[in-house]
């Protein structure tokens, strides 16, 4: 499923294709690209739930927390998000790329993945996907995009 999400995100973002595509056509295109039906449906469901979170119709997060409070991860979250991932989320909060609400959206979407393995690079892409469509998060998205692609360029040199 994560491969389908990555494919969709890279294809639509970098080519600036209109995001409102007929789901049947999109499913056909993804099938022709070699993805399995189950992965396609899971990815589309994942994106639908992300859209619900972004427009406020999804699960509401308790955001009345003290700004100095620390996020305590559940055992399941800690197993899926290693210390590098959790540290990176904290770093992004500290530099105000993520706020309490967007952090919780990221964690929710990470935990909804069916990935057997998940690392910091995967987390960065999930963060980009979450920030991409949230009104008012354009600067945060740009900062995150700079962090992701700046690091990729450094690996090329």
Curated annotation (Swiss-Prot):
A Pfam family: DUF494
Protein name: Protein Smg
Lineage: superkingdom: Bacteria
Gene behind the chain: smg
Organism in which the protein naturally occurs: Sodalis glossinidius (strain morsitans)
Similarity field: Belongs to the Smg family.
Transmembrane segments: none
InterPro entries: Smg
């Amino acid at each position: 499923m994560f491969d389908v999400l990555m494919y969709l995100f890279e294809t639509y973002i970098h080519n600036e294709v209109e995001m409102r595509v007929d789901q049947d056509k999109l499913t056909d295109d993804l099938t022709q690209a070699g993805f399995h039906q189950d992965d396609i449906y899971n990815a589309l469901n994942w994106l639908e739930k992300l859209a619900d979170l972004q427009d406020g119709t999804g699960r509401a997060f308790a955001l009345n927390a003290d700004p100095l409070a620390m996020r305590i991860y559940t055992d399941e979250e800690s197993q899926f998000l290693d210390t590098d991932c959790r540290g990176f989320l904290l770093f992004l909060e500290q530099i105000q790329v993520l706020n309490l609400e967007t952090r919780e959206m990221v964690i929710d979407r990470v935990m909804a993945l069916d990935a057997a393995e998940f690392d910091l690079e995967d987390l960065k892409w999930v963060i980009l996907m979450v920030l991409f469509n949230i009104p008012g998060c354009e600067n945060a998205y740009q900062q995150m995009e700079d962090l992701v692609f700046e690091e990729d360029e450094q690996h090329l040199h």
